Amino acid sequence: MLKEERFSRIIELVNERGSVKTVEISEDLNTSLATVRRDLNELDSLNKIKKVFGGASSIKNAQFVGIEEKLENKITKNIDQKNSIGAYAAALISDYDFVYMDTGTSVEAMIPYIDANNTSFVTNSIYIANKLSARDFKVFILPGEFKSETGAIVGASTCDYLDGFNFSIGFLGANGIQEEVGFTTPDMNEAMVKSRAISRCKKVYVLADSSKFGKIFQVSFSKDPDLEIITDSLGDDTKIYVRKYKEDKWYIP
């Protein structure tokens, strides 16, 4: 088989399946593994596919999303998954913890399941603050500009205020997760607050259902591969987006 024919078939396989192992390509083309590896290196340099450990993934899989969904729509989506994620995350809170809770429907889903005593919370979400207060938890709400679309409080003053806190544990939401760009959100001001909050937490968990994998929004708030992720599932179809994130950093209820 000619080189151009191999290239065409490899691209076709990768785009059809999302990701393909080197050995599978070798068997399909009836070509040596060494030849396939050279082909993958060249196709990667041409930006036709993405070479990953043990194979290749499609560069077409990542979905750029330019518009943030309204909060009322987010609340009604993936409810069971978010409740499962929320319950798992809530169990990580211990007595006397000082907790940061970011905006986000998965983070908000934690609240009914929190069972720790003598715990204090800081949040930049008015909705989370109200729900925590309704359960008689001690809550501090950050100052700043109110963003009605998400119920978040954001801005430079919010970030400055965060610098005065040292959290034992923090929980953040993400609109998108993709290995090249990390954790993303549509709003620069929200991204600034998320980044600053991460720097003030001893332990950080990102809560995101599997629909967030492969989506890219305008602003990255972290590219740290050591951030711990709590999600509802992580099959081969979603792993291709987060291969650089170590499997011992994923938690699936």
Predicted regions and their residues:
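HTH-adjacent hinge/linker in prokaryotic transcriptional regulators
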Residues: 2-5, 15-23, 28, 34, ...
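Hydrophobic alpha-helical segments
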Residues: 36, 79, 83-87, 126, ...
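Short glycine-rich, polar/acidic loop-and-turn segments at beta strand-coil junctions
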Residues: 62, 105, 126-127
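Conserved phosphate- and dinucleotide-binding cores of soluble alpha/beta proteins
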Residues: 2-5, 9-12, 22, 51, ...
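Short glycine/serine/threonine-rich phosphate/pyrophosphate-binding segments
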Residues: 106-110, 213-216
